[in-house]
């Protein structure tokens, strides 16, 4: 059965760096069973409705500004899979899923991690968008539907950050984590294996935590985690390949199921 990886994306410069986090992603790529294909849920494709990339050769999207030229010169030419995209349309029904053949591609939430895990870019991939109009529990249920892919050897990668507050980022000097960021990061880890009604899940109700709103002033970087937790069968081990908080308020926590 294929693995699920949650909240593995962090910040753009990791693409060019060799550090604790990038080495952990490289290790995952070398040690996990090689998937037949990969479905990525990225914080950077936050849409009204649900879409899936359905082109043969998705472009590499550089959806950021103000970084070194080397980052813009980096491309990740992994093949797309229109067949897998259509499979997702059928699997997620009755949720309507739009086949995107030109508007998007692989944004840095997906290729920024996968270029470290699978640098040869030779595994077929599709990217699934996050519907901005739906509540947290809905995204968890989407993960439950995606769980079937894992039995087909398809890896689910959810890319985001459980703490992502750019307004409080420490760009210079002291980069120690804020107490509220550490508290929320620990809260997430403590509740990864919680089982019960989805509507009562502490990580679905993350805004109930005193640091939830400050850690996630907008939801798009948090929600990918719920897709992976939804795909968990309740019995597999859940492990943390790497953890940490950078620049005060960017969580580097990665979660692996299976």
Q: Which functions belong to the PLM regions below?
A:
Residues 53-77:
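A charged helix-plus-loop insertion that forms the helical arch/lid used to bind
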Residues 1-5, 9:
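Single conserved hydrophobic/aromatic residue that forms the stacking wall/gate
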Residues 85-140, 145:
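Internal, conserved structured core segments that host functional sites
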Residues 9, 41, 88, 128, ...:
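A residue-level signal for conserved active-site and pocket-lining positions in enzyme catalytic cores
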Residues 11, 44-46, 162-163:
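Catalytic metal-binding/acid-base residues of hydrolase active sites
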Residues 33-49:
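N-terminal low-complexity or amphipathic/hydrophobic leaders
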Residues 19-33:
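Short catalytic helix/loop segments, enriched in acidic residues and glycine
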Residues 90, 94, 123-124, 132-134, ...:
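Surface-exposed, charge/polar-rich loops and edge strands
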